Amino acid sequence: DRDEDEFVMALSKFAEASEPTEAELGAGVEDHRKFYMGQTTNKKCACYTARAAVIYTDPEFIDEEPDASYTGNVAPFYPKNVTWKFKRPQDGNAPASAGTKLISLPKLKESERDALDENHVNYLTDEYKRQYVKEGVCLNGEFIDIVIGGDWIAKRMRDLLYDILLNNANINYGDDGFGLVATAVLQALAE
C-alpha cells in the first residue's frame, strides 16, 4: 500500500482509463471498469480524474488507513440505497474508548479545508457535533455514488439484455420486440 502522490495519481489515472468508450464496447471490448480509493497526506493534492476518490489524513494518522475505513463502512451497502456523502469511516486503527475504533480527525485550518474541497479531496470533518466525510466525491467532483451506481446499472442492464437475447430465438423489430428489450432496461433502472 503506497500513499505517495505519484502512486495516488498514477492509480487514479489508471482507474479513469479503465472505462471503455462506446466504440470499444461496440467492438466487443469487455467492460472492466475500475474505481480507485486512496489516501493522501498532501493538503494540496490535485489530480482531476474520474473514477477515483482520495481521502486526506494528517501524516501521523496515515497508518489508520482512512481509505480502507471509509470504503469498509460504505461499500457493503453497494449498490443500492447508498450515498458516500455524510458517512463515517469505521473500524480504523485509531485508539478509542469502549472498544470502538475510528480514524482520527485531521487538524485542518479553514483555508486547508477549502483547498481540499476545491481539489475534490475528501476528509473527515466535525460539524454539528458529528464526525463524517463531508462530500463523498471523486477527484473530478462527481459523487462517488453516481459513478458506482452508473457502473452497476450498466452491468445489470447488459446482463438482462444478454439474457433476453440468449433466451429468445427471434426478437422482431416490431412493438413487441422493442417492448421485450425495453423490459431489461426498465428492470435495471427499477432495481
Language-model features, listed with the residues they occupy:
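Flexible, active-site-adjacent loop/turn segments at secondary-structure boundaries
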Residues: 84, 100-101, 130-131, 169-171
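Extracellular Cys-Trp
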Residues: 1-99, 137, 142-143
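Glycine-centered secondary-structure boundary/capping sites
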Residues: 32-34, 44, 98-107, 112-121, ...
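Structured, hydrophobic secondary-structure cores that serve as assembly/anchoring elements
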Residues: 136-191
